[in-house]
């Protein structure tokens, strides 16, 4: 395993651990999810270059599309929750209420 792939894998792992550990604020969870998507994008960009596979070249573009959609939905949800409840604490939310 090359050092670049190892660093990207470690970045994904640390972002996943951050998502699991810092669940109290919605903003920190969204930042960790963005870190995961960035590391997946970098890994999907490096892999076709190393394997010389032409079929895998559109995959990074699809990952960028999903990352942009995830960021837009996350920021809209953060704005709505912040305006409604006054903070982004996840523990204070009862999402089962209508």
From Swiss-Prot:
Compartments annotated for it: namely: Mitochondrion inner membrane
EC number(s) on file? 7.1.1.2
Q: Which family does it belong to?
A: Belongs to the complex I subunit 4L family.
**GO BP, sorted A to Z:** ATP synthesis coupled electron transport
One GO MF term on file is: NADH dehydrogenase (ubiquinone) activity
Question: Could you name the domain of life of the organism this protein comes from?
Answer: Eukaryota
Q: Give the species this sequence originates from.
A: Alexandromys kikuchii (Taiwan vole)
User: What does the subunit comment say?
Assistant: Core subunit of respiratory chain NADH dehydrogenase (Complex I) which is composed of 45 different subunits.
**Keywords assigned by UniProt, alphabetized:** Electron transport, Membrane, Mitochondrion, Mitochondrion inner membrane, NAD, Respiratory chain, Translocase, Transmembrane, Transmembrane helix, Transport, Ubiquinone
Question: Keyword Membrane, does the record have it?
Answer: yes
Q: What's its catalytic activity?
A: a ubiquinone + NADH + 5 H(+)(in) = a ubiquinol + NAD(+) + 4 H(+)(out)
Protein's job: Core subunit of the mitochondrial membrane respiratory chain NADH dehydrogenase (Complex I) which catalyzes electron transfer from NADH through the respiratory chain, using ubiquinone as an electron acceptor. Part of the enzyme membrane arm which is embedded in the lipid bilayer and involved in proton translocation.
Query: Transmembrane segments in this chain: where?
Result: 2-22, 26-46, 59-79
* Keyword Electron transport tagged: yes
One GO cellular component term noted in the UniProt record for this chain: respiratory chain complex I
State the gene name recorded for this protein.
MT-ND4L
Q: Name the cystine pairs.
A: none
The record gives the membrane topology as: Multi-pass membrane protein
Q: What is this protein called?
A: NADH-ubiquinone oxidoreductase chain 4L
What PANTHER family does this protein's entry cite?
Answer: NADH-UBIQUINONE OXIDOREDUCTASE CHAIN 4L, NADH-UBIQUINONE OXIDOREDUCTASE SUBUNIT ND4L
Any Pfam family from its record, for instance, is: Oxidored_q2
